[in-house]
Amino acid sequence: MSCDDGRPLAGRTAYMDQRDLLLPWLSGRDNVTLGARLRGETPDRKRADELLARVGLGDRRDDRPATLSGGMRQRLALARTLMEDRPIVLMDEPFSSLDVLTRLLLQDLAAELLAERTVLLVTHDPMEALRLGHRIFVMSGSPALLGAPLEPAGAPPRDAAQVSRSDAYRDLLARLGVGGSP
């Protein structure tokens, strides 16, 4: 596969699964720097520590995944994905196991650090799609088909309170078959 610039996708993508896929025998920092080590590169430990701090795990960098809660593990997986610093990022339900406040904070962080990149975000949360998406597609049917894109106004991350009262939110809910009022 190649992009519209003709260059191959290999080495240009990062992926975050809805499961954290952390290696249980590695510390938090070692999980975050895993990609560099697998490529034979020297890990940027300073950047890893900065990302761990930004996701609220700066004091847990030496801990193994088994000692972390589900939400902490998800934050660690997000830090690992952001550490890859790739132009194309695939994210499958990256915020699903987080409490509401942490979810909003990490959505803001992801929007900041992934600006100007191509991100394919899979989510079942209409609010999340509207906060973070430039173009939102709803898949439905069997076999699944993509509907026409919804393009919300403004730049991500959009304010959650404003999104919940927006016409775009009502439109997205209608496309999902959930009535018209948030």
Located regions from the model:
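Short coil-to-helix segment of the ABC ATPase nucleotide-binding domain corresponding to the Q-loop/switch region
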Residues: 26-33
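Catalytic Walker B motif of ABC-type/P-loop ATPase nucleotide-binding domains
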Residues: 89-93
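A short, proline-enriched helix->beta-strand linker immediately N-terminal to the Walker B motif
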Residues: 83-87
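Helical segment within the ABC ATPase nucleotide-binding domain
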Residues: 103-115
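Conserved ABC ATPase "signature" region
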Residues: 43-60
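Conserved beta-strand-loop-alpha-helix hinge in the C-terminal portion
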Residues: 139-171
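Conserved ABC ATPase signature
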Residues: 64-68, 72
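Hydrophobic anchor residue at the start of the ABC signature
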Residues: 78
